[in-house]
């Protein structure tokens, strides 16, 4: 059994099927990268996993607990969200809080740590990211890459079972893509389980242990990263990868 297992996850909206009977297993320590065209349902899948959007039906097994998406209690939702931290594409930092406060406040108010405990955790993470000198700056004083890295630090500080990343490099220049790649690889070395949505093949190949192709709400293929990129099994995957490589060339 994986750390996370999703069975028959379906999401409909106004009569349209956005995600169709998805089955997915993520093992502890894996970095699953989900790729696909714009509108394929990648971000919706992340939001459904974190319950920012409620799936219409399906089941989730997280650790030793299994949940029916159609019968979640308020306690179930809190438990799931505590284990699945999400790093948003637009960073989602509080502009009226410093970089340090953006990391510490979820620890103080969400996990009931003391201010001293939260600050120690945040300062350690900022030091690892070589962002100690940015601790007292506000998001508007930080570059996009720095904001993204603060978002990553905030997610790591919560010590979730899994960190979800929504297009973490989509608005960054190539040099910063390399920095974010190294940050994610560092998390992987620590044993952190991650699910990453991206449309950038080079980035996906750098960080993935497993890769999945989502197309029009259907999970077409899931395979180890080396196999996925060198010997994809499904014709749809082959066509997508060839088109994406041509576009990036």
Model-derived features with residue positions:
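ABC ATPase NBD coupling module
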Residues: 67-85, 115, 231-232
């Amino acid at each position: 059994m994986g750390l996370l297992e999703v069975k028959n996850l379906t999401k409909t909206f106004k009569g349209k099927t956005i995600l169709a009977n998805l089955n997915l297993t993520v093992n502890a320590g894996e970095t699953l990268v989900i790729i696909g065209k714009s509108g394929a349902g990648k971000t919706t899948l992340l939001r459904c996993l974190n319950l920012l959007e409620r799936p219409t039906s399906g089941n989730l097994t997280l650790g030793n607990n299994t949940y029916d998406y159609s019968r979640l209690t308020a306690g179930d939702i809190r438990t799931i969200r505590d284990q699945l931290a999400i790093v948003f594409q637009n960073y989602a930092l509080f502009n009226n809080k410093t970089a340090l406060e953006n990391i510490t406040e979820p620890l103080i108010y969400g996990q009931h740590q003391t201010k001293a405990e939260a600050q120690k955790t945040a300062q350690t993470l900022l030091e690892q990211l070589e962002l100690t000198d940015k601790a007292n700056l506000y998001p508007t004083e930080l570059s996009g890459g720095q904001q993204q890295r603060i978002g990553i630090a905030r997610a790591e500080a919560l010590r979730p079972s899994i960190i979800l990343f929504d297009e973490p490099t989509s608005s960054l220049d190539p040099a910063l893509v390399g920095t974010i790649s190294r940050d994610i690889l560092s998390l992987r070395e620590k044993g952190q389980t991650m699910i990453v949505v991206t449309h950038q093949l080079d980035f996906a190949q750098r960080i993935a242990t497993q890769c999945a192709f989502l197309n029009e709400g259907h999970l077409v293929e899931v395979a180890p990263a080396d196999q996925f990129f060198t010997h994809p099994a499904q014709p749809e995957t082959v066509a997508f990868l060839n088109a994406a490589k041509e576009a990036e060339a």
